[in-house]
Amino acid sequence: MRRLFSSLLFALVFAFSLCLQTSLAQEDPHAAHMAVGYVPREILERALPLRKGVGAVNEKVTTSSTEAQAFYNQGVAYLHSYVWIEAARSFNHALRIDPKLAMAYVGLSRAYSGLEDPKAAREALGKAEALSAGVSEREQRRIAIRAKQLDAMADLPNAAKHLAYKKAIDDALAADMNDSELWLLRGNAEESTAAGRGQRGSAASIAFYERVLKVSPDNFAAHHYLIHSYENLNRVQEALKHGAVYARLAFSVPHAHHMYGHDLRRDGRVEEAIAAFRKADELEHAYYKSENILPDYDWHHPHNLDLLSTSYQYMGKVKEAERLMRETIALAVVSDYREFNKKEWPAFLLARGRTAEALEASLVLAKGKYAGARAIGHVYAGHALLALGRTPEAIDELKAAEKDGQELPRLGAMVTMSSLEPYVEGLRAETYLRSGKMKEGRDILKEVMRKLRAVPGPDAWSQGLFRLEAIARTAREVGDWELAEYAARQMLDHDPAYAGTHYALALVAEHKRDKVAARKAYAAAEKYWRNADADLPELSQVRANAQEQSSTR
């Protein structure tokens, strides 16, 4: 009865979130003009104060007002932390003080791209261009750079346009080698597409951000982007170093604490990571209360909750993990990325053995707004149906996932075909395993595991760990102990500090009648689950099996 209520509650929450997304359009036929992306324009135009702890920026622009200059700098600081709403508010406030501040329109254009509104971004740039005759040559070059970027963003597969964007920055740098904002842009531009904004940097980006630190040693933005770049290279210790600095220099920004939490978790310091994610959450809730802004409009809030909830799941605190996940799914969907990441909920339910609930949640997701969410909903519905022994229906879900997946772009900043592909292939492989085609399923899953582990970034790292665990669990269920051992050893290589890793290894050792290895693995699992829920079923099994192993020594 309780689980039936949970399923009904989830459906109601999802329906409410859809209502929130469409309410503006229903209330006013001109609602599209009243919002930028997914945020009401009224919010973006609200006045705000100058704030401390958001990161220091000192980029001189053409204005006679020191106050307008200060709000412009604050807007740029918020851009570098992806705080799109407050960046837009800061730039709009600067324009109220000085309507001819052309660079504020460039800032608005960048903020509007962050809010996923290319039309509004282009319109804001047009206003900057209209004012360009009255600004310095340096600012004129920046306006031209933004135009090149928008052209390239409108045609992401076009390598020539991406190259033209990078060349425009290079030409501007030739005229001013000490412009830290240009060096930051150049690092962003080194990403795989012109939409790069510091999240997907690599070894090539690092040199540009290191150059910024030579020009501006306490540049918080460079530290922020270096965290992402080092994470993408799996250089956790370097990322941690920059994360600590970013959190110190931008102490009022939730994302700064969140970023530090990323790598504390990767370093095995999960309780410290939880404290960092909690700090971000506290700052966010204080902001929503003081500014009277719904958390639904803040892209960062559900993202932070995702990492916080899965950190609790990692520790075996599944009750708190579930509470936080329910808080997340209650938020309105504002982007394809956000809706796609609602997959964490059915994945969690499957991991907890709550298959019927997982199927219900997956089918809701399969009716989502965006193709990526619909596809991943079908994938998890397929996994749930296979667990329930309903293979023909699971195959139908696989076909539906493939169909929706065809709508996804090959390139982009959010959900792409490559984001979905390992999940679809994982479902295909499970249909083979449960149909007796062990070799076919095993071969596919080994490649899936390789791809999951190759995806960079902290989100992918934790999601990959739980997917490896799910594969190991499925392998045990179908009696493929060779695959179960392979998956468990992949988990060990991926994260030796996870209790679930040692639990999976213990079950394999027990099956092989290797009492010494089983006893060692059970002891490690119990150690790492030392702060887990007291009634965690896996922990109870670990203790019972460990006791049995000891009694038969």
Task: Name every feature range the model reports, one short phrase each.
Residues S64-H93, A147-N158:
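Alpha-helical segment of the N-proximal tetratricopeptide repeat
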Residues N73, G107, I143-K148, L185, ...:
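"A position-specific structural signal for the A-helix of alpha-solenoid helical repeats
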Residues V76, R110, R146, N188, ...:
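Residue-level recognition of tetratricopeptide repeat
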